[in-house]
């Protein structure tokens, strides 16, 4: 009798964990579709629900950062980018977005540090780094002149 109970319990746990994994992926996919349809509040809700099921989903944090970027909430954008980079330190988009925030805030040393990291991990967006460094080189001499 106890063997049957253990078997049923094990089967229940396996099925339950599979449904949680599927639900997490489903929330992200729904959120991504809503994001592409420019329904940002609904997408934000889906990404947040996905994070509840899987707090280590770096893509959900990244898309939350993109939503907050669109909504011009830089503090929340930065927090979500930090979470993304904490989970996935080599995420190109998150590093690039963080560089742009640091550039806006005139935090040139952070831009340079992020640029060094970006240079090591970039695969798709390498040209963006060059543009930011060009912008940085145009700004820094002006800072020294004044």
Language model features with spans:
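Canonical positions in the second alpha-helix
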Residues: 49-50, 83-84, 117-118
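Residue-level recognition of tetratricopeptide repeat
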Residues: 57, 91, 125-126
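Terminal, low-structured helical/coil segments at or just beyond the last alpha-helical repeat
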Residues: 112-146
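Canonical tetratricopeptide repeat
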Residues: 63, 97-98, 131-135
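Register position in tetratricopeptide repeats
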Residues: 36-37, 70-71, 104-105, 138-142
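Structural marker of alpha-solenoid helical repeat scaffolds
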Residues: 53, 87, 120-124
């Amino acid at each position: 009798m106890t063997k049957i109970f253990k078997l049923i319990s094990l089967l229940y746990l396996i099925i339950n964990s599979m449904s949680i994994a599927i639900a997490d992926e489903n929330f992200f996919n729904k959120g991504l579709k809503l994001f592409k349809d420019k329904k940002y509040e609904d997408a934000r809700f889906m990404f947040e629900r996905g994070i509840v099921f899987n707090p280590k989903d770096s893509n959900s944090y990244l898309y939350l950062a993109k939503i907050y970027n669109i909504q011009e909430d830089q503090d929340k954008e930065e927090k979500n980018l930090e979470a993304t980079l904490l989970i996935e330190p080599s995420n190109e988009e998150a590093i690039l977005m963080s560089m742009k925030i640091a550039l806006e805030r005139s935090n040139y040393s952070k831009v340079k540090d992020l640029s060094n990291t970006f240079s090591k991990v970039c695969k798709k967006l390498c040209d963006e780094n060059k543009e930011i460094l060009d912008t940085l080189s145009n700004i820094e001499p002006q800072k020294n002149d004044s």
